[in-house]
């Protein structure tokens, strides 16, 4: 009898257990639902309205300046840029075996936050960055040295020997250092319009890779040479590329190499390594990195030689035969988005009649309001556990550190040639604070002497922030 009763109790206990598990499951779903609802309730109507108005302004800008592109708004943050029907997409992606798409989706809120952030960034690799970044010398430094012979800098002295010749102690360049800058691409359409004098009128000119500067192309691309961003392959020809200018700053996009160092020790030009995040969307290539570099130093960035006609079949260059490039339609769409976000100004033969007419681009005031609203929106949607203390200009600082109070070593090595030792290659590193443009000095004070760097390989808003003493007389 007792055995029979025990047998009846067992299914009953199992049933009660199932009910309990189901109740917990339902409670979890409800909690998640209400948590999501509460997160949505964090969205402020005024912020949504500001961002919606900004989207409408961007849409109108694309309609006026997009040369056939159109913007289709999804919500207050997302839109799609579409090429017109009938656009001949001839760019074939052999890896995925598809032709390039004719429409691209972008999150404008994220784009505004990212590109406004570059206006406060340091985009040159420095010793202070490696000192402050967690495992900066052990891990990251090794990633920037080709053929090191190890995956990490177990021997820091050896790694320093590789980097010293191009590693300044602190940022050699500063936000707001120049007012108006030109970034000159390599597109063949540069030969359609004589932009040379206009390009040379800028405070600083940025060029890419091996693009020549000579009398043959002077009326098209100018002759002014201030900065040049090069990929690893072009860096192998740096002596030839830099010939004719002792002051042009060479910035290597990827890694250094012992062969590069031997060449650097023989030339009078400043040479540094680029430091910046790898974009997962948007246009790819050196041109985009040149824009990042320019934006970290300049108020206004004008770009030339980046325009591509929808449907073209070859990646043309103004100084050589066509060659294979990458994602022209995606690049064209993304550059247009950047112009309508106030990041760049596009110059091309197709726009010669619209010269200096930027009235359809959202104003700095509207962009600033959209940036503030996007920042509040971003932080309201972050899980409580991931939110950091602080807000404002330092709210995205993930890692903090202090710069060495001493001035620190300038880039270089004892075995440099007499040509380099007697040159002015370190002029940017030793430039007195009082010699900076007033806007750059004011920005430095506003930032309380803090340098901000991107944390490569992490989230877009994770920064390494380094404090400097506010010694304004140095």
Curated annotation (Swiss-Prot):
Highest taxon of the lineage: Eukaryota
Lumenal side: 36-474
GO molecular function, one term: sialyltransferase activity
Keyword Amino-acid biosynthesis: no
Membrane-side (Cytoplasmic) residue stretches: 1-14
Residues spanning the membrane: 15-35
Region of interest: Disordered: 376-421
Protein name: Sialyltransferase-like protein 1
Species of origin: Arabidopsis thaliana
BP-aspect Gene Ontology terms: pollen germination; pollen tube growth; protein glycosylation
